[in-house]
């Protein structure tokens, strides 16, 4: 079964200029083998229906497409059980031990060690370890786009970026949900990225993933004989260096330094990269690049953990 990206046929017509009408674009997509249009019928809408009714388009093409959709539904048992599982049944599957083990294995095997000059693995004899970066004290940064956390926090996004959905930049209707109780929306300094450094987003994390520990919490749990010096240091985007001095002081005091680097994957105005959030520059954020250079002059072992994005 071949399914379009959200707004894919509309994009082909409006941006790529394929087809004289949206119906013709839909016909060309169906002829090429696309069975379903998402998220709603536009190319596969009234104009394409009229092409089939009038005989302008061969109904055999429609029959083949409908057949593939029906076959997929029969294979999945959707005619016998057309509704989603109830809460308890769904929860039972989500909490299966085998699934958790596979998820952990996948996470471990997806990590890439780019370079190691003998710093790793960390010695148990480290007295002071500096942990610096915006990802270290927030477990949300472990979760990428389209995870439950990402989608729930996007409800509070000041602007949507999901292609093909009302409220997206393409629709010209930017500006939707705001924080509850009239709370102002805060942004990463000097950027249009909405900050998630608010209690509301911590509550979402605790609600959905109550046992998920941050990097800081995990290090404290595992390195009980080491003093962990945590400092925020710099944001996930932009040029802000206002917290550098406190972080550099931690670098000077520490035996080893861990820097969390990269942006925040997600969607809408809540992320630096993800669904509909593009970047023209693949380098590290300017503030992070500047901090690495500033920290390197002290000659301490620096470990960079790149979380996501640039």
Question: Which sequence ranges carry the predicted segments?
Answer:
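Mobile "lid/hinge" segments at catalytic clefts and subdomain interfaces of large enzymes
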Residues: 30-40, 44
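Catalytic-core region of carbohydrate-active enzymes that cleave or remodel glycosidic bonds
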Residues: 1, 16-32, 67
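Conserved, charged catalytic cores of large soluble enzymes
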Residues: 45-46, 67, 71-92
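C-terminal non-catalytic regions of proteins with extracellular/luminal or membrane-system context
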Residues: 3-6, 10-13, 18-19, 44-59, ...
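Residue-level detector of short coil/turn "hinge" positions at structural boundaries
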Residues: 36, 58-59, 80
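Short, well-structured alpha-helical segments that form the helix of a local strand-helix-strand
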Residues: 26-27, 61-70, 104
């Amino acid at each position: 079964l071949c399914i379009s990206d959200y707004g894919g046929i509309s994009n082909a017509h409006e941006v790529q200029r394929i087809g004289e009408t949206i119906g013709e674009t839909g016909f060309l997509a169906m002829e090429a083998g696309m069975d379903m249009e998402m998220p709603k019928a536009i190319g596969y809408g009234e104009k394409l229906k009229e092409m089939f009714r009038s005989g302008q388009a061969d109904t055999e093409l429609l029959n083949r497409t409908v057949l593939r959709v029906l076959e997929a539904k029969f294979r999945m048992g959707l005619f016998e059980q057309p509704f989603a599982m109830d809460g308890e049944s769904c929860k039972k599957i989500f909490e299966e031990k085998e699934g958790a083990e596979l998820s952990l294995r996948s996470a471990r095997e997806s990590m890439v060690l780019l370079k190691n000059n003998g710093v790793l693995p960390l010695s148990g004899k480290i007295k002071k370890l500096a942990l610096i970066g915006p990802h270290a004290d927030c477990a949300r940064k472990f979760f990428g786009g389209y995870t439950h956390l990402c989608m729930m926090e996007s409800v509070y996004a000041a602007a949507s970026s999901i292609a093909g959905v009302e409220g997206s930049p393409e629709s010209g209707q930017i500006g939707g949900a705001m924080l509850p109780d009239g709370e102002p929306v805060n942004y990463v300094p000097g950027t249009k990225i909405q900050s998630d450094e608010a209690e509301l987003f911590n509550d979402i994390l605790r609600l959905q993933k109550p046992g998920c520990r941050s990097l800081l919490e995990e290090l404290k749990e595992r390195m009980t004989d080491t003093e962990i010096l945590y400092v925020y240091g710099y944001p996930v985007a932009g040029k802000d260096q206002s917290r550098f001095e406190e972080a550099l002081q931690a670098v000077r005091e520490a035996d080893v330094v861990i820097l969390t680097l990269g942006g925040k994957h997600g969607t809408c105005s809540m992320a630096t990269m993800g669904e509909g959030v593009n970047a023209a520059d693949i380098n590290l954020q300017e503030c992070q690049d500047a901090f690495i250079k500033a920290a390197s002059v002290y000659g301490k072992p620096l470990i960079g953990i790149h979380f996501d994005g640039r």
